[in-house]
Amino acid sequence: MLKYLAKRVGRSILTLFIIVTLVFCLLRLMPVEGYFANYEKMTEVQIQAGLQSMGLLDPLPVQIVRFWKDALHGDLGVSHIYKVNASVTGILAKKLPISVQMGVYAMLLSLVIGIPMGMFMGRFKSRWPDKIGTAIIVLIQAVPSAVYYLYIQMYGTTALGVGLLFDASNWKYWVLPVCSMSLGNIAFYAMWLRRYMVDESNKDYVRLARAKGVSENNIALRHIFRNAMVPLVQYIPSAFLNTVVGSIYIESLYSIPGMGGLLVTCVQRHD
């Protein structure tokens, strides 16, 4: 188990290194004006001096090595346009907590709803709980996320009596974005847990338990459910990361001052 986890962590670190390095290289293809907030008012001498001070005139391999050296020491550089000369680490420290907090709430909600839903679907295979659950999953997966995000916002704001400007101090403002973020994972957990429970229910140890006279509820909860959860657990960390990363549109939709809005703003302003 430890060897497997170490291999997964190693692959994740390598993937992260490759992606970040590629993005770093692609950003170096950005036009020169993207590095300066007042580019139109600057002379050529000032532009070259600014590029030199930022180390952008050095060879690309030198820039990559310097970037990773600074990043490993917690220095991600400074913002050139969003907040001139402000530490990127400081900016992220202000924006990241609310995105992580919202991601945690969405993950907990998806587990609380998705796991029991999948368990009931697997326990009552081909019966009405399974059919209703399957219909809900198909609906969630078939409809584009942006569509039900907008419907949740349209009707939810009226039902809860909240405005469009996010207020972190009022719990009502957390309900709609958290529900929106959790829908995809609810369908994911329910679908896969249902599948794993159906697979487990056909194994020999289940037949043996039935032959011994163990009740179906005990078999489902104490044996099938426990074993079906084992392969599902490995997806929880990646699902959480996907939830946080996928919050970009939702944060923009609800004007949440988190990583999503920050990313959109910085991309639009070429920072």
Please place each PLM-identified region on the residue numbering.
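Alpha-helical transmembrane segments of integral membrane proteins
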Residues: 2-3, 96-129, 145, 168-271
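Membrane-water interface at transmembrane helix exits
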Residues: 23, 27, 31, 35, ...
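Hydrophobic alpha-helical transmembrane segments of membrane transport/permease proteins
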Residues: 16-65, 156, 160-173
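Short amphipathic alpha-helical coupling elements at transmembrane boundaries
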Residues: 49-52, 66, 70, 90, ...
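Residue-level signal for discrete positions within transmembrane alpha-helices
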Residues: 12, 95, 99, 135-142
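An internal, D/E-rich "acidic patch" concept
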Residues: 56-115
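Generic alpha-helical transmembrane segments of integral inner-membrane proteins
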Residues: 9, 13-26, 104, 108-116, ...
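Membrane-water interface segments at the C-terminal ends of transmembrane alpha-helices
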Residues: 23-30, 67-69, 135-165, 182-184
